[in-house]
UniProtKB/Swiss-Prot annotation:
Cofactor(s) for this UniProt protein: Mg(2+)
GO terms classed as biological process: defense response to virus; maintenance of CRISPR repeat elements
GO molecular function, one term: metal ion binding
Enzyme class: hydrolase
Encoding gene, per UniProt annotation: cas2
Protein name, as recorded: CRISPR-associated endoribonuclease Cas2
Length: 108
């Protein structure tokens, strides 16, 4: 059974150089690679993805690693769904409700 302690969230945070045209192209390619594997942009350099298992997190970590540009810093954080639901978010000065995990399908 999937529980909030097995379900995971991944957060990829990065600071990439964008001085030269080649660096901007590499940074855009990295952002697009994150979108291609199902991440959502939370902020310009912060991307989130919901995962159903640690194995899926491990697979996505390898995919992110393969897409890394030559320069810059990239951090990948992993949180259980229970930990992530405690996140506090604001839009301006308005507190936002916690982001919900996507619905799971039941297979018989």
């Amino acid at each position: 059974m999937l529980t909030g302690y097995r379900l995971m969230w991944m957060v990829v945070m990065f600071d990439l150089p964008v001085i030269t045209k080649a660096e901007r192209k590499a940074a855009t390619g990295f952002r697009n690679a994150l979108l291609d594997v199902g991440f959502q942009m939370s902020q310009f350099s912060v991307y989130l993805r919901f995962c159903t298992s640690q194995a899926q997190v491990d697979t996505l970590c390898r995919q992110v690693e393969q897409a890394l540009p030559a320069g810059g810093k990239v951090h990948i954080f992993q949180f259980t769904d229970k930990q992530y639901e405690r996140a506090i978010s604001f839009h301006g000065r308005s507190r936002q409700p916690a982001q919900k995990a996507p619905d799971q399908f039941d297979l018989f």
